[in-house]
Design a protein with these regions (language model features):
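Catalytic-core elements of nucleic-acid end-processing and repair enzymes
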Residues: 1-146
């Protein structure tokens, strides 16, 4: 995981960089972020066009392509390392009106009542507005558990 920013209440946002980290997040939060991470990873690797046809040089640039192409997956952690919320932001953390930002708590519950200040801080870091009505997919409905 990669440190992104500190948040109020002794909380920290980290970027989920690998499928293994996504699997741990899914287990800790009892939701399906691993599935979405894997789908995004596969789509990004599938869209990669190497600059060279040489076998040896084929994958140079793949990692940076993946980081530019796939959504940013993040986890909010407390000081003990406990998972509090999971976020999926547009590729590069840049505004994209076509992209549905998702922020959920454990078991896809609403993270805003307990972590709104931390979510706001993440939005400030990326220059995004992360309002509940836009980012919590189950507002006004019962969450899907997986």
């Amino acid at each position: 995981m990669q440190f992104i920013c500190d948040a109020p209440g002794h909380k920290t946002w980290f970027r989920i960089d690998t499928e293994g980290e996504a699997a741990l997040e899914s287990a800790a939060m009892d939701h399906a972020v691993e599935k979405y991470f894997r789908q995004a990873w596969e789509a990004a690797t599938g869209s990669y066009k190497p600059a060279s046809g040489s076998f040896i040089e084929r994958d140079i640039g793949l990692k940076s392509h993946i980081q530019r192409s796939m959504p940013i997956f993040l986890t909010l952690r407390n000081t003990e390392g406990g998972a509090l919320a999971t976020a999926m932001l547009p590729p590069g953390g840049q505004h994209d009106a076509r992209f549905r930002i998702i922020i959920v708590g454990p078991e896809n519950r609403d993270p805003y009542p307990d972590h709104e200040d931390a979510i706001r801080k993440l939005g400030e870091y990326f220059g995004l507005t992360l309002s509940r009505d836009r980012c919590y997919p189950y507002a006004g409905t019962r969450p899907s558990w997986k």
